[in-house]
Amino acid sequence: MSAYRRPVALIVLDGWGLNPDPRANAVAMARHPNFDRLMARYPHTTLTASGEAVGLLPGQMGDSNVGHLNLGAGRIVYQTLVRIWRSIQDGSFYTLPVWRPVLDRAKQPGKALHLMGLVSDGGVHSHIDHLLALIDLAKRENVERVYVHAFLDGRDVPPQSALPYLERVEAKLKETGIGAIATISGRYYAMDRDKRWDRTEKAFLAITQGIGHTAGSVAEAVERAYARGETDEFVQPTVIEGVDGRVREGDGVIFFNFRPDRARQLVRALHETAFDGFKRPEGYRPVELVTMTQYDQTFTDIPVAFGPQFVDVPMGQVVAEAGLRQLRIAETEKYAHVTYFFNGGEERVFPGEERVLVPSPKVATYDLKPEMSAYEVAREAVKWIEEDRTDFIVLNFANPDMVGHTGVLEAAIRAVEAVDECLGQVVDALLAKGGAAVIIADHGNCDQMVDYETGAPHTNHTLNPVPCILVDDQRLDAKLKPGVLANVAPTLLEIIGLPKPPQMDADSLLVSNAEGA
């Protein structure tokens, strides 16, 4: 062990919000004896994990990317959603130089501009207002042929809410007179991130070959999907008849999602010369492509509208520079969050940083296996703690969020109960070594599984506060202030005994003697 002599962990119960309403509340309905005993024994408070508190727009729900950025940064990190929104408001969006090549290409004879991305106001991966602004941009630039390839949400917004969003897009296209919606596809297909290439292939074939289900109109496409029992997320790729909006060689393409992870696979299929995810019917066909943000550091030849913002001196760097060992551990669904995002949005591994990736189960939807890989994550973490192999741990339990997204209440309850059991195992191992833990959530989700107004499944995140428990037998009498996610890193540094760097402008949640006086 290090000179600090005890392990300290940040344990993220992803999607475990605190909802005062018990209705369809998986957290309230589940049995969680370990969480309850920790709340009863140790200091605790609540954290705001949405809106301006995490660098989003007021009333905007948080997500895991945003949450882990703020957790590791020790300051509020203003998100890309806000940056784009501000640029639209001040007009600078419409004059970004990055648009020029793709617009010029689309204006060439026989060419078109394709706008593709998630069409909703969920604000997690995209925002419909950004698409509408791009249509306005195309009109200003006299682009005559614009085709929208709309990916349906149903996850960060209600499961059957696509039509009003699509109607807004169609109204804007009619107003400008420059295009049409060419295809629709549920995000399950168009935005897979787990290398399930058969899903990506279906979306790709609809977009580039016009292969898939067909419908005479957008409304008919959605209605037929609902009749097949599909909610928005799972709508099979559908081509709108009478709109030949296939992406052809030399066309211009703007992918307007701002969150990278679920956009990468389709971009690879469209852009890479040596692509092996599936067989493309016509092989590689180059297009003029722009993405809203940097989707991957390996996409060096794809222009981006809003470049990455890096966080100087995140917590992982402070821990590394102190000579301490750190472990990042999660299953596949949240691995990027405890590594890339917690490290400030950069692909970097600090000295002494070890990573353990536990594969997520290969199931169609996680309600089929609510425990996911939580037991394996816990088992591995306990092993590292018992063997004195690490000083600081960042651990994420994905279940409350990922199962919450399915909208299946019974499964979400089982997910919470599985995580509670695993939480107890990890905390007990830490305490046996004289260690400490800060237990939090990065946002809510399974704390509301039904839309209280409509009775439909509620599959998106919530705006509810999240718990924060300081498990430390050396600080049983400590008091914690209410705070935000940015306060967590300074709190952890205080517990470890490391000074907070000046770049972290958030305070520790621990009430000082002066404050308590």
Swiss-Prot record:
<keyword id="KW-0464">Manganese</keyword>
<dbReference type="GO" id="GO:0004619">
    <property type="term" value="F:phosphoglycerate mutase activity"/>
</dbReference>
<dbReference type="GO" id="GO:0005829">
    <property type="term" value="C:cytosol"/>
</dbReference>
<feature type="active site" description="Phosphoserine intermediate">
    <location>
        <position position="64"/>
    </location>
</feature>
<keyword id="KW-0324">Glycolysis</keyword>
<feature type="binding site">
    <location>
        <position position="14"/>
    </location>
    <ligand>
        <name>Mn(2+) 2</name>
    </ligand>
</feature>
<feature type="binding site">
    <location>
        <position position="125"/>
    </location>
    <ligand>
        <name>substrate</name>
    </ligand>
</feature>
<dbReference type="GO" id="GO:0006096">
    <property type="term" value="P:glycolytic process"/>
</dbReference>
<feature type="binding site">
    <location>
        <position position="64"/>
    </location>
    <ligand>
        <name>Mn(2+) 2</name>
    </ligand>
</feature>
<dbReference type="InterPro" id="IPR017850">
    <property type="entry name" value="Alkaline_phosphatase_core_sf"/>
</dbReference>
<dbReference type="GO" id="GO:0006007">
    <property type="term" value="P:glucose catabolic process"/>
</dbReference>
<feature type="binding site">
    <location>
        <begin position="259"/>
        <end position="262"/>
    </location>
    <ligand>
        <name>substrate</name>
    </ligand>
</feature>
<feature type="binding site">
    <location>
        <position position="443"/>
    </location>
    <ligand>
        <name>Mn(2+) 2</name>
    </ligand>
</feature>
<dbReference type="InterPro" id="IPR036646">
    <property type="entry name" value="PGAM_B_sf"/>
</dbReference>
<dbReference type="InterPro" id="IPR006124">
    <property type="entry name" value="Metalloenzyme"/>
</dbReference>
<protein>
    <recommendedName>
        <fullName>2,3-bisphosphoglycerate-independent phosphoglycerate mutase</fullName>
        <ecNumber>5.4.2.12</ecNumber>
    </recommendedName>
</protein>
<dbReference type="GO" id="GO:0030145">
    <property type="term" value="F:manganese ion binding"/>
</dbReference>
<feature type="binding site">
    <location>
        <position position="442"/>
    </location>
    <ligand>
        <name>Mn(2+) 2</name>
    </ligand>
</feature>
<keyword id="KW-0413">Isomerase</keyword>
<dbReference type="InterPro" id="IPR005995">
    <property type="entry name" value="Pgm_bpd_ind"/>
</dbReference>
<comment type="function">
    <text>Catalyzes the interconversion of 2-phosphoglycerate and 3-phosphoglycerate.</text>
</comment>
<comment type="similarity">
    <text>Belongs to the BPG-independent phosphoglycerate mutase family.</text>
</comment>
<feature type="binding site">
    <location>
        <position position="334"/>
    </location>
    <ligand>
        <name>substrate</name>
    </ligand>
</feature>
<feature type="binding site">
    <location>
        <position position="461"/>
    </location>
    <ligand>
        <name>Mn(2+) 1</name>
    </ligand>
</feature>
<comment type="subunit">
    <text>Monomer.</text>
</comment>
<dbReference type="InterPro" id="IPR011258">
    <property type="entry name" value="BPG-indep_PGM_N"/>
</dbReference>
<keyword id="KW-0479">Metal-binding</keyword>
<feature type="binding site">
    <location>
        <position position="193"/>
    </location>
    <ligand>
        <name>substrate</name>
    </ligand>
</feature>
<comment type="pathway">
    <text>Carbohydrate degradation; glycolysis; pyruvate from D-glyceraldehyde 3-phosphate: step 3/5.</text>
</comment>
<feature type="binding site">
    <location>
        <position position="401"/>
    </location>
    <ligand>
        <name>Mn(2+) 1</name>
    </ligand>
</feature>
<feature type="binding site">
    <location>
        <position position="405"/>
    </location>
    <ligand>
        <name>Mn(2+) 1</name>
    </ligand>
</feature>
<feature type="binding site">
    <location>
        <position position="187"/>
    </location>
    <ligand>
        <name>substrate</name>
    </ligand>
</feature>
<dbReference type="Pfam" id="PF06415">
    <property type="entry name" value="iPGM_N"/>
</dbReference>
<feature type="binding site">
    <location>
        <begin position="155"/>
        <end position="156"/>
    </location>
    <ligand>
        <name>substrate</name>
    </ligand>
</feature>
<dbReference type="Pfam" id="PF01676">
    <property type="entry name" value="Metalloenzyme"/>
</dbReference>
